[in-house]
């Protein structure tokens, strides 16, 4: 009887672990009511004012800004600060924790870059760090220091630190 109970317990734990690990890829929120065929083979990219919708969170990049710094916070010679303002909405029934260091990974012209404290002080309307109550939003900046002649900034965003699913936001330098 003990072996049967132990076997059932192990099976239940295995199914629970598999169920927790299943996560869906983000979907692009449609701007219009017409829906075309979606091709899930190619990875989706998102841009300004496009929403990546995961099962529990919705990420929308709402603004891109470039700065040469202010006060004591200036980039190295030949660099600029770039900030992307995001609105993150909690779609779940549970509180969600956001960390700009753990959920975001940046690349400038295919070279890894990291979140910059100095850049974030320039874009001082808040960071993308904190807890979001169910149905509420978090608005803040993800900021990096990049070469002044940058062409493409790519941000890969995870919906949780336990997930492998990500959305890729791509921004072009129009200056």
Predicted regions and their residues:
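Repetitive helical segments and hydrophobic/amphipathic motifs
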Residues: 11-12
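C-terminal motif of bacterial Sec signal peptides marking the signal peptidase cleavage site
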Residues: 15-19
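Positively charged n-region of N-terminal signal peptides that target proteins for export
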Residues: 1-4, 8
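Conserved functional micro-motifs across diverse proteins
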Residues: 20-175
């Amino acid at each position: 009887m003990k072996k049967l109970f132990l076997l059932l317990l192990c099976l239940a734990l295995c199914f629970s672990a598999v169920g927790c690990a299943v996560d869906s890829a983000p979907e692009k929120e449609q701007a219009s009511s017409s829906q075309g065929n979606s091709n899930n083979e190619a990875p989706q990219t998102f841009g300004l004012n496009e929403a990546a919708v995961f099962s529990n969170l919705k990420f929308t990049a709402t603004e891109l800004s470039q700065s040469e710094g202010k006060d004591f916070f200036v980039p190295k010679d030949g660099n600029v600060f770039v900030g992307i303002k995001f609105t993150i909405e909690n779609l779940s029934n549970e509180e969600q924790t956001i960390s700009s260091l753990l959920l975001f990974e940046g690349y400038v012209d295919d070279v890894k870059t990291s979140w910059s404290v100095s850049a974030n002080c320039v874009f001082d309307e808040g960071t993308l760090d904190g807890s979001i109550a169910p149905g509420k939003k978090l608005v803040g900046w993800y900021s990096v220091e990049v070469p002044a002649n940058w062409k493409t900034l790519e941000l890969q965003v995870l919906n949780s630190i336990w997930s492998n699913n990500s959305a890729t936001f791509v921004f072009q330098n129009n200056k």
